[in-house]
């Protein structure tokens, strides 16, 4: 199912004389993906994949998936438009995932999660260039997962693995 089927002609798209659909180049990634409906579909597919992954599902035990999806949708909307300069995303990532870092969450899990996001986008027929752009928005957050895992390991062992 293509995301353009969710929103057949998004306001940022226009039709040329040859009836080719074009995107307004100034539109945000969020809008080019198809807006709220498209991101909702991506997040739903994304969480289906995350919950089926035995290497990740343990991190979701005992939490409200509906609440997580709402947070994820808001975060992706922000990330795919423009993250406010006043928002310290690395700190937010560390704070929001602190319990999970203590459970062993690390950059290898981040890589799996990012892979599932790419697979969700692919399964919904998102164009490769848009999928690549979406993944490129998320990849810089990997450093927060490396840092969070190192902090949790230090707290657990008392050994600082980040120093030489």
PLM region spans:
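Heme-based O2/NO sensor domains and their adjacent alpha-helical segments
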Residues: 23-27, 40-126, 131-137, 150
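Intrinsically disordered, low-complexity segments enriched in small/polar residues
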Residues: 32-33, 102, 156
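Short terminal or interdomain "cap/linker" segment that borders an active site or interface and mediates
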Residues: 24-27, 136-164
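Short non-domain terminal segments
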Residues: 12, 57-58, 143
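Long, hydrophobic N-terminal alpha-helical segment
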Residues: 29-39
């Amino acid at each position: 199912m293509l995301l353009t089927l969710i929103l057949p002609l998004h306001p940022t798209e226009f039709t040329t004389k040859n009836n080719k659909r074009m995107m307004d180049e100034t539109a945000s990634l969020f809008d080019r993906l198809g807006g709220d409906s498209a991101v909702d579909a991506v997040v739903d597919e994304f969480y289906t994949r995350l919950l089926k992954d035995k290497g990740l599902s343990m991190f979701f035990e005992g939490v409200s998936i509906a609440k997580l999806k709402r947070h994820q949708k808001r975060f992706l909307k922000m990330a795919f438009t423009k993250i406010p300069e006043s928002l310290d995303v690395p700190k937010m990532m560390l704070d929001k995932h602190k319990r999970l870092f203590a459970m062993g969450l690390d950059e290898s899990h981040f890589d799996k999660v990012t892979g599932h996001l790419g697979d969700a986008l692919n399964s919904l027929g998102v164009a490769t260039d848009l999928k690549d752009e979406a993944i490129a928005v998320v990849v810089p957050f990997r450093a927060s997962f490396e840092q969070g895992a190192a902090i949790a390991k230090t707290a657990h062992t008392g050994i600082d693995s980040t120093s030489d």
